[in-house]
């Protein structure tokens, strides 16, 4: 069982994609240091998060089926430190978080550390708006002055 699990939950638009890219590209080097980043494909943690949270996502939920269980199994079988990272985990419900902790071996002695990356609100709001516009094509909003 992993001794320590670093569970990076985002939040969105805080450099998470860059961090995940660095972790994914450096899996062999991390493994040499005893650190597991369990991913055979770049979006493995995204699919696992969709599965854990049972989120619909444009048909990807069928690809996601069983992904969290597989990721958690690999973490439990690893002896050392494991890292899991995806920003949609920041919106997990209390029940989803409890299920994640249990499946990662928290009740059996694994140390699970939740890592939260944040951004100052002045930059976060426009970044979220821009991301929503990119995904949906258009977005209108009325802002009231105070």
Feature map (PLM): residue ranges:
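PAPS-dependent sulfotransferase catalytic domain
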Residues: 29, 94-141
């Amino acid at each position: 069982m992993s001794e320590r699990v670093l569970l990076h939950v985002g939040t969105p638009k805080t450099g998470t994609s860059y961090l995940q890219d660095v972790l994914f590209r450096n899996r062999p080097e991390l493994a040499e240091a005893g650190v597991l980043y369990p991913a055979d494909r770049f979006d493995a943690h995204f699919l696992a998060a969709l599965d854990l949270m049972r989120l619909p996502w444009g048909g990807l939920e069928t690809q996601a089926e069983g992904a969290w269980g597989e990721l958690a199994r690999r973490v439990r079988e690893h002896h050392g430190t494991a890292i899991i990272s995806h920003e949609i985990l920041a919106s997990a419900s209390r029940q989803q978080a409890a299920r994640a902790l249990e499946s990662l071996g928290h009740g059996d002695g694994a140390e699970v550390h939740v890592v939260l990356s944040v951004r100052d609100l002045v930059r976060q709001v426009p970044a979220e708006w821009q991301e929503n516009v990119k995904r949906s094509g258009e977005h209108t909003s009325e802002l009231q002055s105070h």
